[in-house]
Amino acid sequence: MPLHKYPPALWDVLKLKDGIYARLPEHYRRSLLEKHKPYPVHWKPHGLKYRLNPKSGQRERVQDVPILPYFPPQANKGLWGGEGWVTGYHYANNDKLSARVKKVWKPQLFKRELYSEILDKKFSITVTMRTLDLIDAAYGFDFYILKTPKEDLNSKVGMDFKRAMLMRLASKDSNLYPNDPSKRDQIYNKYKEFVIPMEEAEWVGLSLEEAVEKQRLLEKKDPTPLFKVYVEELVKQIETQTLAEPAIIGKKP
């Protein structure tokens, strides 16, 4: 007899079909269901299912076992480029005859100022050397944020940057360099491949809790004061009574 009515792997999918979750925008619910494997940072996949054993010459199966890093809460406040804490073991005093002790390898963090052309502002962000290399490879901070999928960014502040950039591009006429039309057109043409409608841009990067709260605020209606309700009812009653009464026409002398 199964322990659950539905397998746990389907819980996240079924949750989006009920209650306020079902009323979330379709594009946002679709983004939650789209899962992509992050780029391997701390390990190198073989890329093969089978290989020849160099000693026996027999074909043997190759198994890729990924190294899953731990991302502490402070990783959401910076751009670590997919790096995280890796837990393992090493020999004490670098001696194989010594005891094996636990060790945590952590990435080296730096504080750097990064400039965004779309937002026209500098930001002081905690980064790693790999992040800086990825920014250089993408030809700029904006391209790195817009091109990198959420699984590789793996940062709340990174997704906040992406949402702010997409919203700025979507509202080109009002917020994108309002005092410099030539600069506005130049920046817009440079990043126009990433332009999406404002209705989608404002939902990018929101967590499920934030999206639910946003949907509640959109559906929220302030209660109408009772005195307004009673005044409207009184006006309708007077209008109905006036129309029902016969008109009195006075006789001419």
Curated annotation (Swiss-Prot):
The molecular function terms in GO held by this entry are: structural constituent of ribosome
Keyword hit for Glycosyltransferase: no
State whether keyword Mitochondrion applies.
yes
Presequence positions on this chain: 1-55
Q: One GO CC annotation, please?
A: mitochondrial large ribosomal subunit
Where it mainly occurs, coarsely classed, is mitochondrion
Which family is it part of? Answer: Belongs to the bacterial ribosomal protein bL28 family.
Record protein name field: Large ribosomal subunit protein bL28m
Q: Organism source for this protein? A: Xenopus laevis
